[in-house]
């Protein structure tokens, strides 16, 4: 079944987006694995490392346009994922949809600061921050205190006999001019978001990151998963810079967990609920 597609941010910014997206999908289909794709990109690149004065400026805070995206693929408009699932992963996703129709939606990441992990953190609607250096790029997500390190110093992945799965996996990359190209593996797979599919630990990906203008960073993402996907899953993830008043820079929330003041819900006298008052100000913030 072909999923229904909507008007994504990419489509809003480029009227030729449907044709561009199809070319990107076909690009991923040329390779049997994300690693093969990544190595082909590396061969074609001009530079693989940057000097300090060549590092791009990705400073500031960034957010997903239009608020928190509902789906990993912003072209998707209903609950039919654009991922081409197979086997038990297709069955699990169908069970999720059936449960949702009955009013039961599973969301283990909505409380207690449990990391969404990779690739789910890419779609997170809370602020993002990027710390770019010649040898590493850090992608930080405010929600759930997520930190993803992408090594660009020429190292390979953790050797297989030392490696184990983690929430964000093991990411390496290189620079092609001002474009960051990454490969990720050794993730825990798992759940990608509310009413979205599960993926396996066989997941690996290629991402192509670049700043397209002063206000926009985009990432073209191809996810390969030999156990969960029939074909690579391509999406474009877009991040817009959050406006900041001069002299009053914004920052990520210091800490995110069950006990963060803005996450504690308490019962009111009338039986309703509200968030607990912040204790570092005398102002009434109800």
Residue map of PLM features:
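PEST-like low-complexity, intrinsically disordered acidic/proline/serine-rich tracts
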Residues: 5-286
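Sec-dependent, cleavable N-terminal signal peptides
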Residues: 1-3
């Amino acid at each position: 079944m072909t999923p229904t597609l909507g008007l994504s941010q990419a489509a809003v910014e480029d009227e030729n987006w449907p044709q561009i997206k199809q070319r990107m999908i076909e690009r991923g289909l040329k390779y049997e694995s994300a690693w093969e794709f990544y190595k082909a990109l590396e061969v074609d690149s001009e530079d693989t490392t940057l000097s300090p004065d060549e590092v791009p400026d990705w400073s500031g805070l960034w957010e997903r346009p239009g608020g928190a995206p509902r789906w990993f693929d912003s072209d998707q408009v209903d609950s039919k994922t654009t991922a081409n699932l197979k086997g038990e992963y297709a069955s699990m996703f169908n069970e999720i949809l059936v449960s949702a129709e009955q009013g039961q939606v599973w969301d283990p990441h909505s409380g207690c600061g449990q990391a969404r992990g990779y690739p789910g953190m890419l779609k997170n609607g809370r602020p993002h921050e990027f710390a770019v250096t010649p040898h590493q790029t850090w992608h930080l997500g405010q929600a759930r205190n997520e930190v993803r390190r992408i090594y660009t110093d020429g190292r390979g992945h953790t050797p297989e006999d030392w490696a184990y799965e983690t929430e964000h996996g093991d990411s390496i990359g290189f620079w092609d001019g001002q474009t960051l190209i990454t490969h990720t593996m050794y993730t825990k797979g798992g759940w990608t978001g509310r009413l979205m599919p599960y993926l396996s630990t066989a997941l690996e990906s290629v991402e192509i990151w670049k700043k397209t203008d002063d206000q926009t960073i985009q990432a073209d993402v191809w996810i390969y998963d030999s156990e969960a996907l029939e074909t690579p899953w391509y999406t474009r993830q877009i991040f817009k810079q959050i406006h900041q008043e001069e002299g009053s820079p914004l920052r990520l929330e210091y800490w995110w967990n069950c006990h963060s003041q803005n996450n504690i819900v308490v019962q009111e006298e009338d039986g309703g609920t509200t968030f607990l008052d912040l204790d570092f100000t005398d102002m009434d913030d109800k």
